Amino acid sequence: MGKRKSRAKPAPTKRMDKLDTIFSCPFCNHGSSVECIIDMKHLIGKAACRICEESFSTTITALTEAIDIYSEWIDECERVNTAEDDVVQEEEEEVEEEEEEEEEEDDEDDHVSVKRKYNF
């Protein structure tokens, strides 16, 4: 008589670590000062700094976690900063182009005056 086939033990389930709900502020860089609040009743997520009182709110879904709200805030800050940098860079380029045009006009004026000297 043979042995019965033994069953393998089920693999142990891994515990999921809880995600952070308190983060550092992107404005004042104070560690653990931003707290994320999720209002499922109104589907609004809010991240607010207790130190500098900056805040950000966004619409949420049933799957949204605190880290998602904070990540959206950081992404929005980066998007605004790059947009401002682009505007400043465009303004600087326009000023440089205007200066170059003025220099070219000055150079043309110099050439005209030299020609007038020889025309007499």
Curated annotation (Swiss-Prot):
Residues 84-120 are annotated as: Disordered. One of its GO terms (cellular component) is nucleus. Gene3D superfamilies: 2.20.25.190. Residues 84-110 have a biased composition (Acidic residues). The keyword Hydrolase does not apply. Disulfide bonds: none annotated. Zn(2+) binds at residues 25, 28, 49, 52. PANTHER family: TRANSCRIPTION ELONGATION FACTOR 1 HOMOLOG. Belongs to the ELOF1 family. This is Transcription elongation factor 1 homolog. It comes from Arabidopsis thaliana (Mouse-ear cress).
